[in-house]
Amino acid sequence: MKILISDPLAKEGIERLKKERGLEVTEAINLEEKELIETIAQYHALIVRSETKVTKEVIDVASHLRVIARAGTGLDNIDVEAATKRGIIVMNAPEGNTISAAEHTISMMLALSRNIPQAYLSLKEKRWDRKRFMGTEVYGKILGIVGLGRIGSEVAKRAQGLEMRVIAYDPFVSSEKAEERGITLFELEELLPQVDYLTVHTPLTSHTKGMIGEREIGLMKKGARIINCARGGIIEEDALYKALKQGKIAGAALDVFEKGKPFDSPLLELDSIVFTPHLGASTEEAQKRVAIVIASQVMDALKGGEVRNVVSLSTLSSFEKISP
């Protein structure tokens, strides 16, 4: 069976696939959609990260495709509905980058609090602006987490280690479960006025797109700070820009954007924002981990073994073993 890898994957995962008897592995990085459409018909599995767009047009001509595997978490670059209708399994590897994403969130929060990127650039320009970059402690502050899944929970643990008070909104987590972690749950409208820092950790879906907009930001206290290391589009950038310009929000830290590369975004003009180019999962450990995990999952799925981390459950009627 043939496997196409269309985004960079750590060598440990590729080597594992190539060692498996009966599998033919092709690496073709940075394919245009037209090129992917022209070549996909011959493959039984497609492994991607976030760059490759697996559109309905690609899926419609993928006559032999059985598995689409996302080496990572987010699925907004894959038309899961179209794949499901075609009976193609869509899977991801959500646990592989959990720690890296949580650590990056905390790093962004601290950099935002102490104006580290701005102070760095100032010093590079041979200026000594200590007063200009007066920061704020996170100790004793309230962190609001929207989405208390794997990453949100790890962020909570680290924030508690910094002696922050952590509260959260997640309709899928029970109050009892949250309280076991020392976290109090609130409805979103109740949470927002309380927080000094707000961080979002949800997938991008029709329900979460724009969930932090002008109305929600308006509920927050003056001087609060916002962090998004999850998915672009969860926070409305126009509303965030307006709130930052007006001084309603003191600052923001963004690792993701509504458009993949926000070079024409007015947000880049603001000094009150810390930016990184989607680095949440960009650690050696996370890349190796997700590559190994997704390689194992693809091999098992193609060979009729245990099928893990599937997001298109209606495609699994012919499989006996399913693992979450």
Indicate residue ranges for each PLM-predicted region.
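An N-terminal-biased, well-structured beta-alpha scaffold segment characteristic
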Residues: 1-91, 191-193, 213-219, 236
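N-terminal Rossmann-fold cofactor-binding loop
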Residues: 7, 29-30, 170-172, 230
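Short, conserved active-site loop motifs that form the nucleotide-linked donor/cofactor pocket
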Residues: 23, 88, 183, 272-274
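Short, Asp-centered acidic motifs that coordinate Mg2+ and/or phosphate
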Residues: 44-45, 67, 197, 225, ...
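Short glycine-/small-residue-rich Rossmann-like dinucleotide-binding loops
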Residues: 51, 73, 196, 202-204, ...
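Rossmann-like dinucleotide-binding domain for NAD(H)/NADP(H)
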Residues: 90, 214, 222-324
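Rossmann-like dinucleotide/phosphate-binding beta-alpha-beta segment
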Residues: 131-222
